[in-house]
């Protein structure tokens, strides 16, 4: 057993008391991102090592692996703690998203180590989708690169409010304050173009040597800020979903016998209470919450993030993908939306193509009506394009086969985030973030929609023998 963990359990008075203490710690989900070979995996290995989260047998195995696959000469290659795939170890790079867990006395952490190569940008977007904070690594020798900008923009797009810019490998530039200041200024110039307000912090460090990771560096007396670990332990995270209205996407209908019908899922935002009047969309039918059932027993109130089963007072028709919300809220269904898309397939995305869409447990189809623009990652400018290439990011108009109830992604990542699936191969080819639901075209003053008027004009022009009258009252 890890000696530090054993000591913590002993101090808490046993395993059960230690587990209770762990449950009451706050949880921070963060990812490491940046360009290839910036030291992301090494940084995570250093965090695990310096917080004493490595078991003795893991440390022994790491020594042996460092001799066979290591890239640091005689030194311990901490990146091997995270790079688990054989291909990753052979190439000395990260390919898949690797998740690691560790804790300190102040907080629990889940880390997503994401790949830096451009062809694995889709993996990075996957890792970032559930995180509250992003550590953006920059090699002190190279400065701000294209992937630095790309990952910054994707993190911002996915609603991550906290960015920690870790300027790594300071030992290779002589721990130069001038180098740190120059990179900091370059990044702030770029970050000024990112949408929204961001909490951006800068930490100069050496993941290989441990400077300013968990302990203050003696080699950089000019830096008097917190270490990286101190930033992670103290940053205040405010979850948007806690302050948003109730959203409960139905994941499945739970009907174990004739006496019970419940609607299971995870509460995406807000809270729900027993007795609360709720509305089912898209049908609009209303009812009251009779019970809130969980594995550990019934609740009187549930909050965002909890997996629950709702039992309603009335027997009404509810299916997987329906959305439950407070009865007093009016959320119209829409059939089109402007969606920010991160494209993940070799075949480009073009207007006119159709795909399967999954959003909040519901599966439907959508057609690409138009690509409004693609974002140039280097300067965040928008340019008109005919198609969106692999790893391209752009704003796309989608029309769905049926009306959907949507929030914007910034309001609610669950009801505003979708995945795009190829209908033939069933492969996920894109990630979408709803920027703006587009409401149906309003009826004209005549009472007819634009579509009906256009169809009427077409029939009268090409089929006059049908004798169709002009809906606007003309001849």
Swiss-Prot record:
GTP binds at residues 34-41, 113-117, 168-171. Keywords: ATP-binding, GTP-binding, Nucleotide-binding, Nucleotidyltransferase, Transferase. Residues 25-239 form the tr-type G domain. CDD domains: CysN_ATPS, CysN_NodQ_II, CysN_NoDQ_III. GO terms for molecular function: ATP binding; GTP binding; GTPase activity; sulfate adenylyltransferase (ATP) activity. Belongs to the TRAFAC class translation factor GTPase superfamily. Classic translation factor GTPase family. CysN/NodQ subfamily. NCBIfam families: CysN, PRK05124.1, small_GTP. This is Sulfate adenylyltransferase subunit 1. The gene is cysN.
């Amino acid at each position: 057993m890890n000696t530090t963990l054993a000591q913590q359990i002993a101090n808490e008075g046993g395993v059960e008391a230690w587990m209770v203490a762990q449950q009451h710690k706050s949880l921070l989900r963060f990812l490491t991102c940046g360009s290839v070979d910036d030291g992301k995996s090494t940084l995570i290995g250093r965090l695990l090592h310096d917080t004493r989260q490595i078991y003795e047998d893991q440390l022994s195995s790491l020594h042996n692996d460092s001799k066979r696959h290591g890239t640091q000469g005689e030194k311990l290659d901490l990146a091997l703690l995270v790079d688990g795939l054989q291909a990753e170890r052979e190439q000395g790079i990260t390919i898949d998203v690797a998740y690691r867990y560790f804790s300190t006395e102040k907080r629990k952490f889940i880390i997503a180590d994401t790949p830096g190569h451009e062809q694995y940008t889709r993996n990075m977007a996957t890792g970032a989708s559930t995180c509250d904070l992003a550590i953006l690594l920059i090699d002190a020798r190279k400065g701000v690169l294209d992937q630095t900008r790309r990952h910054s923009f994707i993190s911002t797009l996915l609603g991550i409010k906290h960015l920690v810019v870790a300027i790594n490998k300071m030992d290779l530039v002589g721990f130069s304050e001038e180098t740190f200041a120059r990179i900091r200024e370059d990044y702030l110039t770029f970050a000024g173009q990112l949408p929204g307000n961001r909490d951006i912090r800068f930490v100069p460090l050496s993941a290989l040597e441990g400077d300013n990771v968990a302990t203050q560096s003696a080699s950089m007396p000019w830096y008097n800020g917190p270490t990286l670990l101190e930033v992670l332990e103290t940053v205040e995270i405010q979850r948007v979903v806690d302050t948003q209205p109730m959203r409960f996407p139905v994941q499945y209908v739970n009907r174990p016998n004739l006496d019970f019908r419940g609607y299971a899922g995870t509460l995406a935002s807000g809270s729900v209470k027993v007795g609360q009047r709720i509305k089912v969309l898209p049908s609009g039918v209303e009812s009251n919450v009779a019970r809130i059932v969980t594995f550990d027993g019934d609740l009187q109130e549930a909050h965002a993030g909890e997996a629950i089963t709702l039992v309603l007072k009335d027997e009404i028709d509810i299916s997987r993908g329906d959305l439950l919300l407070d009865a007093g809220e009016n959320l119209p269904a829409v059939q089109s939306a402007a969606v920010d898309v991160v494209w993940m397939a070799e075949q480009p995305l073009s207007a006119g193509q159709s795909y399967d869409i999954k959003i909040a447990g519901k599966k439907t189809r959508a057609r690409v009506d138009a690509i409004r623009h693609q974002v140039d990652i280097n300067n965040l400018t928008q340019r008109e394009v005919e198609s969106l290439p692999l790893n391209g990011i752009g704003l796309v108009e989608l029309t769905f086969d049926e009306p959907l109830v949507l929030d914007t992604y910034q309001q609610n990542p669950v009801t505003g985030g979708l995945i795009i699936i190829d209908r033939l191969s069933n492969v996920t080819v894109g990630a979408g973030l709803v920027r703006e639901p587009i409401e149906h075209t309003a009826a004209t003053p005549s009472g007819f929609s634009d579509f009906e008027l256009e169809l009427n004009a077409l029939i009268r022009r090409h089929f006059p023998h049908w004798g169709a009258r002009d809906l606007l009252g003309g001849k």
